[in-house]
Amino acid sequence: MSNQQPTNIGSMAAITPSVKFLLILNVSIFLIEGVLRIPLSRLFALPAVWWETWSFGSLFTYMFVHANGTHLMVNMLGLVFIGPAVEQTIGSYRFFVLYYLSGVLGGLGWSLLAQEGAF
């Protein structure tokens, strides 16, 4: 058994396929919104009472919009530092399913606790 720590943790060399795809998707949506001034957050955001407006699809899209650059950066840093290890352990398909399930369950939990009218 080796006591050496991996040297590529958090480096771009350690980025796995699903993590890379999610990074590109999240950053692209943020840039489209900011540079082209297309209000994707209005389309993708999760209203607190999504069931009243039949915004079921928002449960699957809200996780790709971010309030500001800091919000995006912190989320993507978490994805870069934790995602590859999880993806390598459970595989790309299961990682993607876990990412989506976590997002959907997080959205459901948030909508139960959020005040009406919140995004």
Give the ranges of each region predicted by the language model.
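Short, Lys/Arg-rich, polar N-terminal cytosolic tail immediately upstream
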Residues: 1-13
